[in-house]
Amino acid sequence: MKVIKTAPLIPSEIKVLEKEGNRVKISLAPFEFGYAVTLAHPIRRLLLLSSVGYAPVGLKIEGVHHEFDSLRGVTEDVSLFIMNLKNIRFIAKALVGQDSSLENQSVVVDYSFKGPMELRARDLNSDHIEIVNPEMPLATINEDAQLNFSLIIYKGMGYVPSENTRELMPEGYMPLDGSFTPIKNVVYEIENVLVEGDPNYEKIIFDIETDGQIDPYKAFLSAVKVMSKQLGVFGERPIANTEYSGDYAQRDDAKDLSAKIESMNLSARCFNCLDKIGIKYVGELVLMSEEELKGVKNMGKKSYDEIAEKLNDLGYPVGTELSPEQRESLKKRLEKLEDKGGND
């Protein structure tokens, strides 16, 4: 029998459908019609943006002064060494379990290797560090050569460009971009379910994969907890009758838009395509129309689709309509970044 409700149905079922390695499929139900996508999308965004991981943000190599130096007795130059280092996923054992509300949680580790040897991620395992992708290559050290370096590994979330970590670095350390998120992929599906013979209810199925720094189910629970805390503030505090200007909203969005395109983790082909035309920041892509992006030299369908997907994940689909004020504010911000050489 149909009824006229005065309150939405509260979901009562959460199931782990599959669990294999660093991947999990979770089912949540039942939801009122339209509620599933309303909740699934922000949870997905929070998984990507607020999941806590570990990354090296400072590097000191004996005998090296900047990232364009060569490494004596090592096949790779410093730039390639750094690129390989960024592909390695760390767990800083001393920081596991510490209160995530504490800022600037870090650990310093020192390494010394003598050639000849093929240095791989597993060689960085120690009493303080656990490597979750041990087979990743790092460097080729030639005979009679020695490689001494130190890392500063931070606990954090999201992506932090090197410009923002420069002031944290002790003398002699090169700042690195920090890609902290341990989430490799998260997608969801919405399905209809029967509740007392009524098919107009929904179920969310999340498919979550991490890089091994965190269990995927724990990552899901953590994202839900973050969402609950963010929304809970409205029930705990009176909402002031304050008018917010457009500039305030634009400043709030600007964190994503002023990030470098490296933060999007694009394929090399895709990145080079944008780099050749001087695109440095996410905001520059947001300002481009669909036709402009497709018209970029060597921009094939595969590259376009990749960029479109990444922008959509950030909440700025290709061709996002901005008000004249927003476009002007964003352009000025990007010009300011260029004038400062990328430092904001």
From Swiss-Prot:
Domain of life: Bacteria
Key word Metal-binding present: no
Top enzyme class: transferase
Stored Pfam families: RNA_pol_A_bac, RNA_pol_A_CTD, RNA_pol_L
UniProt keyword Transcription, yes or no: yes
Catalytic activity: RNA(n) + a ribonucleoside 5'-triphosphate = RNA(n+1) + diphosphate
Matches recorded under CDD domains: RNAP_alpha_NTD
Cystines in this chain: none
Enzyme Commission number, as recorded: 2.7.7.6
Region listing for Alpha C-terminal domain (alpha-CTD), in residue ranges: 254-344
Gene Ontology CC annotations of this record: cytoplasm; DNA-directed RNA polymerase complex
Gene3D superfamilies reported for this sequence: 5' to 3' exonuclease, C-terminal subdomain, DNA-directed RNA polymerase, insert domain, RNA polymerase, RBP11-like subunit
Record's subunit section: Homodimer. The RNAP catalytic core consists of 2 alpha, 1 beta, 1 beta' and 1 omega subunit. When a sigma factor is associated with the core the holoenzyme is formed, which can initiate transcription.
Stated role: DNA-dependent RNA polymerase catalyzes the transcription of DNA into RNA using the four ribonucleoside triphosphates as substrates.
Name this polypeptide is given: DNA-directed RNA polymerase subunit alpha
Taxonomic source organism: Helicobacter pylori (strain J99 / ATCC 700824)
